[in-house]
A protein has these predicted regions:
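Bacterial Sec-dependent N-terminal signal peptides
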Residues: 1-27
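Well-ordered beta-sheet/strand-loop patches within structured domains
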Residues: 19-67, 141-142, 158-477
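Cationic-aromatic interfacial patches
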Residues: 21-160
Length: 477
C-alpha cells in the first residue's frame, strides 16, 4: 500500500506540474511491474543468490523473459486477484505433465496451484503475486525445455544446462504461446515431431486419460510410467535427427530393424543382437556398401578367446569349419605346423578367415557402415535363432532375418534394381561381389524398452539393464 501511495502520489504531482510547463513525462511503471523488477534485481546479492532466494532454477531465462516484456506480469491480475486465465491454462498443463513422461512435482505444481487460497491469509499480496508469477514462469520455461531436449544429457546423464540459444528459444516459445489464442497447443509445439515420439506420447496420454487415477507417477501404473518416461526422454535426445526421407532404425531391445520412409515403416526385420557381455552399441552411421558371398575375417577377440582353445585341442578345427590361417604377410599357414601349446592370447600372431558359402558366419550378405566398434549388419546360417523370443546372441553385430529384401531396397533407391539377379548369382556361385551405394542409407541403432504400435504400448525386456542407470538420474529426488 505504501508503494502504491508513493507511486500514485508521484503521478499526481507530476500531472500538476505538466499543467503549467514542459513536455509530457512517461508514466511510472505499474506497481506489479516494479515489484517484478525489484525482485529480479541482482545487484545486491548477485545472480545466483538472487535466483536461489526466489526459488528459481532457470533464473537467467526468467530474467530474460521479463526484461523483454519490460517486467509486465504474464500470469497475474494487476488488482492482486490471483491467477489470470492464461495462468490457469498453464497450471492445468503442468498438472498433466505425466502424459509427457514428466512429474508435476518437478515444476512445483502443488505450490503454484495453492495461490488462490494463500491470498486470503496474506496482506502483502503484491509481493506474494510477484513470487508466484516468477515461479510459474520458471516452471514453464523448464517444462518447455524438458519437453524439447529432455531433462538429462544423453552421455553424462547429468541435468542439462541450457546454452544461450536454447534459453532464447525457450523464452521465445513461451512468449509466442502467450500471444496465441490456444496457449496449450502453442506451448506443446516445442515437442519432438518424430514418428516414434509422437506415437508413444499419444498412446501413453490415451492410457492415462482412460485411467485418471494413474496421472500421478507415484500411484497407479508407476512401473509403466517410469518405463514410458525413460523412453520419451531417449526419444527427445534424438531431436536433431530428421524423420523425413529413408533410414534404417534398429531397436536393440525389440530385436527389430525397420526401414522407414517419410515416417512410415516399409520393411520390418527380426534381428539378433549382441549378448549382454558383448552388447550392440547405439550409434548413427550410413550403410554405404554391401558385399555378397563374403569371407569372414575373424575378430582378434574371438580368435584368441574362443578359437585358440579349440586349436590347442585340435588344429583340424579350422578345416572342419571352413577357416584358414594367415600370417602377418597374408600368406597361408598350415595349422598343423604350429605349436599351439606355446601360443597365448598375448602372442597370437595370426589372422583367421572363413571361406564364403552357406557355412560362413556372415551368411550370404554383409552390410557395412562406418563405426568405431567394427560392427555391421549381416546374414547368418543360424536361421533358427529368429524363431526365438530372446535374441541377444551375437558378439555385437546385427544378424538380419531377410537380407535379400534389405539389399533389394538399397539397390532400388539407388536406381540399381537391374543388379538384383546378379546378387542371387553371386550367392549361388560363392563369387564375391561388392555393391557401392552413392547416397547410402542412414542407420540409427537405438535402445528403446517400450514403443507404441497401433496406439498400443509394447514393453520389452531391458536386456542390457540400461534403464536402471537412466532411471537413477531421471528420478533422482
Amino acid at each position: 500500500m505504501l508503494l502504491w501511495l508513493a507511486v500514485t502520489g508521484g503521478v499526481l504531482s507530476l500531472g500538476s506540474a505538466q499543467a503549467h510547463a514542459g513536455p509530457p513525462q512517461p508514466k511510472p511503471a505499474p506497481v506489479a511491474a516494479l515489484s517484478l523488477r525489484t525482485a529480479l534485481d541482482t545487484v545486491a546479492l548477485g545472480s545466483a543468490a538472487t535466483y536461489t532466494q526466489l526459488g528459481l532454477q532457470a533464473g537467467p531465462a526468467v530474467q530474460q523473459f521479463y526484461s523483454q516484456r519490460d517486467f509486465t506480469p504474464a500470469w497475474t491480475h494487476a488488482d492482486s486477484a490471483g491467477w489470470n486465465h492464461n495462468a490457469r491454462q498453464a497450471l492445468a498443463l503442468l498438472r498433466c505433465a505425466p502424459e509427457y513422461g514428466l512429474d508435476p512435482a518437478t515444476y512445483s505444481w502443488s505450490i503454484l496451484s495453492a495461490l488462490p487460497d494463500s491470498l486470503h491469509y496474506l496482506a502483502a499480496k503484491t509481493a506474494t503475486l510477484a513470487g508466484y508469477e516468477l515461479r510459474l514462469t520458471d516452471a514453464l520455461l523448464r517444462f518447455a525445455t524438458h519437453l524439447r531436449y529432455g531433462r538429462l544429457h544423453p552421455l553424462t546423464l547429468t541435468p542439462i544446462v541450457l546454452t544461450q540459444p536454447q534459453t532464447q528459444e525457450a523464452v521465445d516459445g513461451l512468449r509466442q504461446a502467450l500471444a496465441s489464442p490456444e496457449l496449450t497447443t502453442a506451448f506443446l509445439s516445442c515437442q519432438p515431431t518424430s514418428r516414434a515420439y509422437c506415437q508413444l506420447q499419444q498412446a501413453w496420454s490415451a492410457t492415462l486419460r482412460q485411467h485418471p487415477d494413474s496421472l500421478h507417477p507415484t500411484t497407479g501404473n508407476a512401473a509403466d510410467f517410469r518405463r514410458v518416461a525413460l523412453n520419451l526422454e531417449r526419444l527427445r535426445w534424438d531431436l536433431q535427427r530428421p524423420d523425413s526421407g529413408d533410414y534404417a532404425l534398429v531397436n536393440i531391445a525389440a530385436y527389430q530393424l525397420q526401414l522407414i520412409r517419410n515416417g512410415q515403416v516399409v520393411q520390418s526385420h527380426r534381428i539378433v543382437v549382441g549378448k549382454p557381455d558383448t552388447p550392440t552399441p547405439t550409434l548413427d552411421s550410413r550403410i554405404t556398401v554391401f558385399v555378397t558371398a563374403p569371407e569372414w575375417r575373424v575378430p582378434y577377440s574371438i580368435a584368441v578367446n574362443e578359437m585358440l582353445p579349440e586349436l590347442q585341442n585340435d588344429p583340424g578345427f579350422l578345416a572342419d569349419n571352413n577357416y584358414f590361417l594367415l600370417d602377418y604377410r597374408g600368406r597361408r599357414v598350415n595349422p598343423w605346423r604350429v605349436n599351439w601349446q606355446r601360443i597365448t592370447p598375448q602372442t597370437f600372431p595370426y589372422t583367421i578367415r572363413q571361406t564364403a558359402g552357406r557355412h560362413n558366419a556372415l551368411g550370404n550378405i554383409v552390410f557395412y557402415f562406418t563405426n568405431q566398434h567394427g560392427i555391421y549388419v549381416h546374414d547368418t546360417p543360424a536361421r533358427a535363432l529368429f524363431r526365438e523370443p530372446k535374441r541377444a546372441r551375437s558378439h555385437g553385430c546385427i544378424r538380419i532375418e531377410k537380407p535379400l529384401e534389405l539389399a533389394a531396397f538399397l539397390l532400388k533407391r539407388e536406381g540399381q534394381q537391374a543388379a538384383l539377379p546378379d546378387i542371387r548369382r553371386s550367392i549361388a556361385t560363392h563369387d564375391r561381389c561388392r555393391y557401392d551405394l552413392a547416397g547410402g542409407l542412414p542407420i540409427r541403432i537405438r535402445y528403446y524398452t517400450c514403443e507404441a504400435q497401433n496406439n498400443h504400448i509394447r514393453y520389452y525386456a531391458d536386456v542390457y539393464c540400461q534403464d536402471e542407470a537412466v532411471a537413477a538420474a531421471f528420478f533422482k529426488p
